[in-house]
Regions:
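Interdomain hinge/linker elements that couple catalytic modules in large macromolecular machines
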Residues: 92-251, 255-262, 266-269, 280
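Conserved nucleotide-sensing/catalytic segment adjacent to the nucleotide-binding pocket
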Residues: 4-52
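Short regulatory helix/loop adjacent to the ATP-binding pocket of P-loop NTPases
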Residues: 61-76, 89-92
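A short alpha->loop->secondary-structure connector
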Residues: 44-51, 69-77
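Structural recognition of the conserved hydrophobic beta-strand(s) that form the central parallel beta-sheet
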Residues: 26, 52-58, 78
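A cross-kingdom feature that marks ATP-driven nucleic-acid transaction machinery
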Residues: 1, 204, 210-362
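Helical "lid/switch" subdomain of P-loop NTPase nucleotide-binding domains
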Residues: 29-32, 36, 59-60, 70, ...
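Conserved nucleotide-binding/hydrolysis micro-motifs of P-loop NTPases
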Residues: 4-5, 58-63, 81-85, 240, ...
């Protein structure tokens, strides 16, 4: 839209003309012409038909009193980068929806990609435009993207000028702590900034969809657990975290602890894509935690995320899931699942589902 001079003229003279054309009519970066929102809303009321317009944008626009919420007319959808399933790195053998609805055993032993392949895919990322690039080229693109975010994008949504060096340093700090409960204070100490500055910069990065908070799960059930409330934070794609700290696949193979953090972030990302739901995490006061929690088909799903798939890892994760679930009183029993970077998907004798990320589908 920023290059469509004809649209500028239409909006300033005959705005209704801009809405004419084949449907669905797409307005990219619509937030640069915020008057489109109310124009589209009124046109939807007039046409009384679904699927008329798609408004896309790389930033969330600032709220305006004059802009109607669009309730009942405009649905909001957060776009994400490709999941493993969408990029062809999962064979789709295990349907998440079927597993939750039926709890039927779904086994698969096909090796789609091994752990080294998973790490390479995480370092490459799920951006469609980078799909045919090498890992090195994709990471170089992402580092350039981070630079653009720090110098341009973070200021575009509200016109507030921010220090690009601090923005870049903040993104690197978030990358190092991806999928963990980093406090504002610890981030401020890490990058040498005031807490207020960190909070404001984080809000700006969320507004342009670079940072996403994984909020703590809050249960309405009777429970013996006192749940913590701190969020975890993720970048838009785990590859962005890898690129921010110059973590090539070879470096990640030599630092499996950080690779495990990226894998947790990848699984949280993919669960959100495949389920269409908001993904939470949970930790109680004793330190017992579950990496991902979401609701699907009327059931609560608890997920532990493990890059490895040794018997010891599976037994410990299954025990942890059962212990956490037992702290609540359930009307409908929860689904317990371990998502791994291994090549086996099966039902554990305890009833816990073990699923490879490379087998997972919607």
């Amino acid at each position: 839209m920023d290059t469509d001079l004809n649209l500028d003229m239409q909006l300033s003279t005959i705005p209704d003309l801009a809405l004419e054309g084949d449907t669905p009519r797409v307005f990219d970066e619509w937030q640069e012409k915020p008057q489109l929102w109310n124009l589209v809303r009124h046109e939807i009321d007039r046409r009384q038909a679904p699927g008329q317009f798609i408004l896309t944008g790389a930033t969330a626009p600032m709220e305006e009193q004059s802009r109607h919420s669009g309730a009942g007319r405009i649905a909001r959808l957060r776009m994400k980068t490709f999941s493993f399933y969408e990029s062809g790195h999962s064979n789709g053998a295990v349907s998440l929806a079927e597993l939750v609805a039926q709890e039927s055993p779904q086994s698969n032993g096909e090796t789609v990609v091994d752990v080294a392949g998973i790490i390479e895919r995480m370092a490459h990322g799920g951006w469609p435009a980078n799909r045919n690039y090498s890992v090195e080229a994709a990471q170089e693109n992402l580092r350039s993207y981070i630079d653009t975010v720090a110098h341009v994008d973070i200021n575009a949504a509200d016109g507030v000028r921010r220090d690009p060096v601090k923005v870049t340093t903040l993104i690197r700090s978030l990358a190092r702590g991806v999928a963990t409960e980093q406090s504002i204070s610890s981030i401020a100490t890490d990058i040498g900034a005031q807490r207020a500055t960190v909070s404001e910069y984080l809000a700006a990065l969320q507004r342009i969809f670079i940072v996403e908070e994984q909020l703590a799960w809050s249960s309405h059930l009777r429970s013996r657990a006192s749940l913590r409330t701190a969020p975890k934070r993720h970048l838009a794609d785990p590859a962005l975290a890898a690129a921010a700290v110059d973590a090539s696949p070879d470096k990640l193979l030599r630092n499996l602890a950080f690779a495990g953090q990226l894998f947790e972030s990848q699984v949280v990302h993919d669960l959100a894509v495949l389920s269409g739901k908001r993904i939470f995490h949970a930790r109680d006061a004793s330190g017992l935690e579950v990496d991902a929690v979401f609701e699907l088909a009327g059931r609560t799903v608890f997920v532990e995320i493990k890059l490895g798939q040794s018997q010891e890892i599976i037994e410990k994760a299954a025990s942890n899931l059962q212990a956490f679930a037992e702290r609540f009183e359930w009307e409908v029993t929860p689904v317990l699942m371990i998502v791994t970077g291994g090549n086996l998907s099966f039902r554990h004798p305890s009833g816990v589902h073990v699923v490879s990320l490379t087998h997972l589908a919607p």
